[in-house]
Regions:
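...captures the hydrophobic TM-helix bundle architecture rather than a specific catalytic motif
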Residues: 1-449
Length: 449
């Protein structure tokens, strides 16, 4: 175990929201409508306290790793094994006797982990704060906000757990937690047929990618006999002769899983419909967390591509990743031009920017797998640029979605104020007015701060 005090606390980063999730769900169901529960914003303040604690622990971990604890050894990884989950015997490929293997629940911290951990914890906290004002002021959400905050916390737990996982099995399990919660959050207004349909569409489309991801992990296990990052990313271990054709297939399967999660062509169809969820859900799924999971998975492949004995063996896959990113970036940006729904414009913009990052990661992987002087310097530069844009985009798009939520919120109130005096026409206007239609938003700059 290494990493000091903050590493010991790191297990609470995914654990706190996971433990708070059933508390809010059960208490909210038992005491909904009670005055004291309403004062707690139907669980919103409890959720905010949990995410605030997570943010503080995350900042401590970042500080210890980069500046305080490690100092000049800030590039060291922190591997903290909390415990073994499954232990079983199996026959190895060699003539060795039965070998015991375990999937331990632990944390793995490097620069990629820290970057995404800060983005996820910081934006989840801000979106939670925004949700208290957004969700609790709308009468349609009365007495059911506890379900929103419970699913929100479980989603955050899944994202944070995936970011800190020290092996691909736990990464996959937390990955699936996010998939379940996205279904619950997108379909929060389940009484609307469009929302229920969008939730099912998102769930089934991303499951297609997840099946490929699971196959890829099985192939990876078959090659390395382990799913631990510390083993797979060990260049001395990777340098041992491996079946490059099988490895190529395994990494391709994993990339398809990332394509589904990050809404890239051709598994992009779920993202625009996911706007049926409340605006905080749009900010959470499409900016801060879920869509970045696919990018994180591809970035995690970097050490495999950089292994010396695999030089030139994986360039075709790197080129494919670059092409998929380029095609999706152009396609999504073109579609965004003809959208009138403010949230769909942001959704297609998100898809395009994520594709831009995929293109950068593909270039980084190509350089890492190349074999010429200075190729690793170019690979690290491309990787850093891609992750820097991921950071920028997550922050900017999270704020844009929350700003669009404020605009939509005020459009609803303005429309109601203009037409409440005419009871006869009110229903007619409500049936045809779309608060998300940008053609109704002319002159807002002079009316809103």
């Amino acid at each position: 175990m290494s990493g000091g005090f903050s590493a010991d606390l790191a297990m609470f980063i995914p654990l706190l929201p996971m433990l708070t999730f059933p508390i809010i769900l059960i208490v909210g169901q038992l005491f909904k409508g009670e005055e004291w529960w309403i004062k707690l914003k139907e669980g919103g303040l409890i959720s905010l306290a949990a995410m605030g604690s997570v943010l503080i622990i995350s900042l401590l971990l970042v500080y210890d790793y980069i500046g305080g604890l490690h100092g000049e050894h800030a590039s060291d990884n922190v591997i903290d094994k909390v415990g073994d989950w499954i232990t079983f015997d199996f026959l190895s490929n060699s003539s060795e006797p039965m070998i015991s293997k375990a999937f331990g629940l632990g944390i793995y911290v490097d620069h990629i982990t820290l970057m995404l951990l800060f983005v996820a914890s910081f934006l989840c906290f801000l979106i939670n704060w925004f949700s208290i004002g957004y969700m609790n002021t709308d009468p349609i959400n009365e007495n059911r906000n506890h379900r929103f905050y419970a699913a929100f916390l479980l989603f955050c737990s899944g994202m944070l757990g995936m970011t800190l996982a020290d092996n691909f099995l736990w990464l996959f399990m937390f990955w699936e937690v996010m998939g379940l919660c996205s279904y619950l959050l997108i379909g929060f207004y389940w009484e609307r047929p469009s929302a229920a349909s969008a939730a099912k569409k998102a769930f089934l489309t991303t499951r297609v990618g997840d099946v490929f991801l699971m196959v890829g992990l099985v192939i990876l296990w078959n090659i390395y006999g382990s799913l631990d990052f510390a083993t797979i990313f060990d260049w001395n271990y990777i340098a041992n002769p491996v079946d490059t054709g099988l490895l190529h297939i395994g990494l391709l399967m994993m990339f398809i899983g990332a394509v589904g999660k990050s809404a890239q062509f051709p598994l992009h169809v779920w993202l625009p419909d996911a706007m049926e969820g409340p605006t905080p859900v749009s900010a959470l799924i499409h900016a801060a967390t879920m869509v970045n999971a696919g990018l994180y998975l591809v970035a995690r492949m970097f050490p495999i591509f950089a292994a010396g004995d695999l030089s030139g063996e994986l360039t075709e896959l790197a080129i494919l990743i670059t092409w998929i990113g380029g095609i999706t970036a152009f396609m999504a940006a073109a579609i965004a031009f003809v959208q009138m729904d403010i949230k769909k414009v942001l959704a297609y913009s998100t898809m395009s920017q994520l594709a831009y990052i995929f293109t950068g990661l593909g270039v980084a992987l190509w350089f890492a797998n190349a074999d010429f002087e200075g190729h690793m310097a170019l690979a690290y530069f491309a990787l850093g640029a891609s992750l820097f844009h991921l950071f920028n985009h997550a922050m900017a798009k999270g704020m844009l979605f929350m700003a669009s939520g404020s605009v939509i919120h005020e459009m609803h109130h303005a429309h109601h104020h203009l037409h409440h005096h005419d009871d006869h026409d009110d229903d007619h206007h409500e049936d045809h007015f779309d608060a998300q239609d940008m053609s109704n938003m002319g002159g807002l700059a002079s009316k809103m701060p």
